[in-house]
Swiss-Prot record:
Protein name (Swiss-Prot/TrEMBL): Putative uncharacterized protein DDB_G0285135
Cell location: Membrane
One GO cellular component term noted in the UniProt record for this chain: membrane
Principal localisation: membrane
Keyword annotations of the record: Membrane, Transmembrane, Transmembrane helix
Origin organism lineage: Eukaryota, Amoebozoa, Evosea, Eumycetozoa, Dictyostelia
Membrane-related topology note: Multi-pass membrane protein
Length: 219
């Protein structure tokens, strides 16, 4: 185990060593701050600027790959061309990629209303969260649905039975009304039948009166 004495020359912090450490720390912080600022600016920038940056980087990488492979159909990169033309071809590739990406990013800005990438990411995240919540909601059990359907069917059957009972009651009332009308007809018949009875009584009375008359017998 090594113990550093305070009086040893290694443990003594000279002003030059302290300043050099501070300078290194400051330079690291500056680099981190620069990268952080660039990322923040890119995230807060519109889609056209962001797409242009990535398009230029992508076109540059594509141009370098095509030059290294000596792709003949790519302009200013074919075999036998000097190195200057190839470098120009790489820059043309980067510019073409940047222009195309700029058009695409501008179209996205028009559609989304100049929303940044962060805003688009948050909106997509909220949308997928809503969809996930809807899918994870507990569905209604099938037994409850079947019970509800059976109850509805029973209610319908009861309503039909009540309607049938009402119809039967109406029919019974109609039959009673018909019976009452038939009874009035029978009384008329009885009255009609009684009429000859009165006539018979009259004839009987006449016969009785005739029997009381004295008929003279001739001698």
């Amino acid at each position: 185990m090594i113990i550093n004495n305070q009086n040893s020359p290694q443990s003594i912090n000279t002003p030059s060593s302290v300043s050099s450490r501070q300078h290194i720390n400051k330079s690291k912080k500056k680099k981190e701050n620069v990268i952080k600022r660039m990322l923040i600016r890119l995230s807060n920038s519109n889609n056209r600027s962001l797409a242009t940056v990535f398009g230029v980087i992508g076109g540059l990488v594509l141009g370098i790959v095509l030059v290294c492979k000596e792709y003949e159909n790519f302009p200013l990169v074919g075999k036998g061309l000097p190195l200057v033309y190839r470098i120009v071809g790489i820059f043309l590739s980067a510019g073409t990629g940047g222009n195309l990406s700029s058009y695409i990013g501008g179209t996205i800005d028009i559609i989304t209303g100049d929303k940044t990438v962060v805003d688009l990411y948050k909106s997509f995240k909220r949308y997928f969260k809503k969809v996930k919540d809807k899918n994870h909601r507990s569905p209604i059990p099938l037994t409850n649905l079947n019970n509800n359907n059976n109850n509805n069917n029973n209610n319908n059957n009861n309503n039909n039975n009540n309607n049938n009972n009402n119809n039967n009651n109406n029919n019974n009332n109609n039959n009673n009304n018909n019976n009452n009308s038939g009874g009035s007809g029978s009384t008329d018949n009885n009255n009609n039948n009684n009429e000859p009875i009165f006539s018979n009584n009259n004839s009987n009375n006449n016969n009785d009166n005739n029997s009381d008359l004295e008929i003279p017998i001739p001698i």
